[in-house]
Amino acid sequence: MQFHSSSALITPFKKDLSVDEAAYEALIKRQIFQGMDACVPVGTTGESATLTHKEHMRCIEIAIETCKNTKTPSNSRMKVLAGVGSNATSESLSLAKFAQKIGADAILCVSPYYNRPTQQGLFEHYKTIAQSVEIPVMLYDVPSRTGVSIEVPTALKLFREIPNIKAIKEASGSLKRVTELHYHEKDFKIFSGEDSLNHSIMFSGGCGVISVTGNLMPNLISQMVNCALKLEYQQALEIQNKLFHLHQALFVETNPIPIKMAMHLAGLIENPSYRLPLVAPSKETIQLLEKTLQQYEVIA
């Protein structure tokens, strides 16, 4: 996985709640032009749980096509880490095979939600998916959403026994987990999945981030990651601190509710539309977002 900075892309909808493909392509191009190494379509932030199977595949396809046809400022190609998560192993399997077939660089697979499998069940789930493809696989641990954690011994076993399981997205909120994983396996790539901990994870063995805030501020997220990779601790910390209030504001309600509204307020998407059961943010949240974006000079 030859990338470090990436954004968990939102999925823009039209007023009729169909996917706004033109807006989606424009958002991806903005990521490319502002220095991100990779994009992550149809993860949690992309509202994958309320997309149809066909829509899910189409979003992956748009991301791959856009990255293939749009060069970065350094004349390279932005990578695509395709979200293939589902609470049904068979559906994740289908999405993983599709992503590989059309050219995804790697896949991100969240633990099955609602089912609450045992650790053996998690192992078999990830093993089955990883062995169905040849491209790299990133585990995704976010117990606040899935109801179950990939325990450290399970994650290490998957990394050691399945050759193309290369990385894990850490959204558990536990730096202890990060340090433990890195201590036992230096080559197991750890990506921050929690913007408030980006700096801390990068300096505790992490090698990159998958950011929600990056939808809005890809240049600053990219700069912070690059500073961390060069071991420029203080410079990276200054950027992390600069983003503190924005990180806070974007998670006052369930993600991706605030980030989609912020993107709308910033003029980056036309419609801040959500599919039920997600609904628009409260008036208080909108006011907070407006105030925060003004502080960052995103809006007047």
Swiss-Prot record:
Q: Which reaction does it catalyse?
A: L-aspartate 4-semialdehyde + pyruvate = (2S,4S)-4-hydroxy-2,3,4,5-tetrahydrodipicolinate + H2O + H(+)
One Pfam family linked to the record: DHDPS
Pathway(s) the chain acts in? Amino-acid biosynthesis; L-lysine biosynthesis via DAP pathway; (S)-tetrahydrodipicolinate from L-aspartate: step 3/4
A GO cellular component term found in this entry reads: cytosol
Active-site residue numbers? Y140, K169
Q: Would you kindly state one Gene Ontology biological process term found in this protein's UniProt entry?
A: lysine biosynthetic process via diaminopimelate
Q: What is its main location?
A: cytoplasm
Query: Where, per UniProt, does this protein localize?
Result: Cytoplasm
Site positions for Part of a proton relay during catalysis: T44, Y114
Q: Name one GO molecular function term.
A: 4-hydroxy-tetrahydrodipicolinate synthase activity
Q: Where does pyruvate bind?
A: T45, I210
Q: Which UniProt keywords apply?
A: Amino-acid biosynthesis, Cytoplasm, Diaminopimelate biosynthesis, Lyase, Lysine biosynthesis, Schiff base
The family database entries (InterPro entries) matched by this protein are listed as:
Aldolase_TIM, DapA, DapA-like, Schiff_base-form_aldolases_AS
Q: What is its EC number?
A: 4.3.3.7
The entry assigns this protein to a family as follows: Belongs to the DapA family.
Q: How does it assemble?
A: Homotetramer; dimer of dimers.
**Record function comment:** Catalyzes the condensation of (S)-aspartate-beta-semialdehyde [(S)-ASA] and pyruvate to 4-hydroxy-tetrahydrodipicolinate (HTPA).
Q: What is this protein called?
A: 4-hydroxy-tetrahydrodipicolinate synthase
Q: Which species expresses this protein natively? A: Helicobacter pylori (strain P12)
